């Protein structure tokens, strides 16, 4: 007999929380990008160049996380719907 393990409500809650986090993260990264661009006009030394490299590496990782999370959110919603249907049958 097939067995379903999971709570569709928990899956949906996590998907919503993940979406809110991704939205918040994207807003924060956008704001920080703007502030960093403006700062480039006044902060120009070797430490800034090193920081910029690290900053861009971090932004790239966050972009990859955003892409991965954006794939998982609809998957989690679909999984919750299928699980709910299964549990109600």
Name each region found by the language model.
Residues 1-89:
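N-terminal secretion-targeting helices of virulence/extracellular proteins
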């Amino acid at each position: 007999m097939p067995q379903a393990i999971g709570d569709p409500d928990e899956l949906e809650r996590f998907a919503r929380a993940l979406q809110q986090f991704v939205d918040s993260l994207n807003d924060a990264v956008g704001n920080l990008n703007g502030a960093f661009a403006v700062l480039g006009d006044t902060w120009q030394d070797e430490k800034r160049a090193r920081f910029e490299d690290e900053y861009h590496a971090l932004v790239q990782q966050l972009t990859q996380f955003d892409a991965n999370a954006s794939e998982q959110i609809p998957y989690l919603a679909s999984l919750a719907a299928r699980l709910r249907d299964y549990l109600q049958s």
